[in-house]
């Protein structure tokens, strides 16, 4: 077959496929397609930088996992607030039945416009999630958590019954069904997950995440969040410092880490992020324990410098603007 006939046959095939499956179902990559990936800011400047595209990619699956009390829910609540600030609709599938509305509100989540579901079984949770995604009406959906998605057979069965592999099969089927729909609807789908220890592992990492391997494979971004240290004011514990590592990314170079301060009651410390990044970019000078901008002293020690910025919102906003401009981040 000549090149001309091949081209005509290809054009005909493309038209037939588009007619059968709808516009956009198939295309040539060079046909004016937008190769840039849309993103919703994570609510953390440091994490937006680590993610490489300024936030969570739309139309993709994201897994956030880590030990208990490391900041997983806080991280996702900030993302939800960020999506709502951009005019997006957010759904929260609360399989753990543990959402604290007051804390969510304190972090900026608009509770009046938050779509909330507290399902009884794993199948119900995933069916609700799929229906919401298919509707095309939401911009972000959060499932909290994969470990709490209990298959119906396990709930209905006896405590002594063996249900090995049920949850993994359920998640595998859900991922196969949902991944295409998530991509078409341009939704950010965030799955929160916990960490478990494999029994009898002598070498290598004994830690694993529940729900089988499907979520690992289908996720475009996997974030591991771990508590690094406590933040104290005198003897009182007022927050934690956590490290978020981009373990996997199909949209940007992975293995970057963001360090964030999570303050009890208020969430991610904006002043802490801006201060650290300003020092990195030499916008703020750090000499010994002192922080200063030219002749203006911000304070001795990181906590005092953070407080100084919080007391001077104009200076904080100015530094944040410079940081965002340098890293090409949107608000």
From Swiss-Prot:
InterPro entries: AAA+_ATPase (IPR003593), DNA_recomb/repair_RecA (IPR013765), DNA_recomb/repair_RecA_CS (IPR020584), P-loop_NTPase (IPR027417), RecA-like_C (IPR049261), RecA-like_N (IPR049428), RecA_ATP-bd (IPR020588), RecA_C_sf (IPR023400). It comes from the Bacteria. Its main location: cytoplasm. One of its GO terms (cellular component) is cytosol. One of its GO terms (molecular function) is ATP hydrolysis activity. ATP binds at residues 66-73. This is Protein RecA. It comes from Acholeplasma laidlawii.
């Amino acid at each position: 077959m000549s090149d001309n006939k091949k081209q005509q046959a290809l054009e005909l095939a493309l038209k037939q496929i588009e007619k059968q499956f709808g516009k956009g179902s198939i295309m040539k990559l060079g046909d004016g397609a937008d190769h840039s990936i849309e993103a919703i800011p994570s609510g953390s400047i440091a994490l937006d930088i680590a993610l490489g595209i300024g936030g969570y990619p739309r139309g993709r699956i994201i897994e956030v996992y880590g030990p208990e009390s490391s900041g997983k829910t806080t991280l996702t609540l900030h993302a939800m607030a960020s999506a709502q600030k951009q005019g997006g609709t957010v759904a929260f599938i609360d399989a753990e039945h543990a959402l604290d509305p007051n804390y969510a509100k304190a972090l900026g989540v608009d509770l009046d416009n938050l779509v909330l579901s507290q399902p009884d079984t794993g199948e119900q949770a995933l069916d609700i999630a799929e229906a919401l995604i298919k509707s095309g009406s939401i911009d972000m959906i959060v499932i909290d958590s994969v470990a709490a998605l209990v298959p119906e057979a396990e709930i209905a069965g006896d405590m002594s019954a063996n249900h090995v592999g049920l949850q993994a099969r359920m998640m595998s089927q859900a991922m196969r069904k949902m991944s295409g729909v998530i991509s078409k609807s341009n939704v950010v789908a965030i799955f929160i997950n916990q960490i478990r220890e494999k029994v009898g592992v002598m070498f290598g990492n004994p830690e694993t995440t529940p729900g089988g391997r499907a979520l690992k494979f289908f996720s475009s971004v996997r974030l591991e969040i771990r508590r690094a240290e406590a933040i104290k004011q005198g003897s009182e514990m007022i927050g934690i410092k956590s490290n978020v590592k981009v373990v996997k990314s199909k949209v940007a170079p992975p293995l970057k880490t963001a360090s964030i301060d999570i303050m009890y009651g208020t969430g991610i410390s904006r002043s802490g992020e801006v201060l650290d990044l300003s020092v990195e970019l030499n916008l703020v000078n750090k000499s010994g324990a002192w922080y200063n901008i030219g002749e203006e002293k911000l304070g001795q020690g990181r906590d005092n410098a953070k407080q100084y910025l919080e007391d001077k919102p104009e200076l904080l906003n100015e530094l944040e603007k410079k940081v965002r401009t340098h890293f090409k981040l949107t608000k």
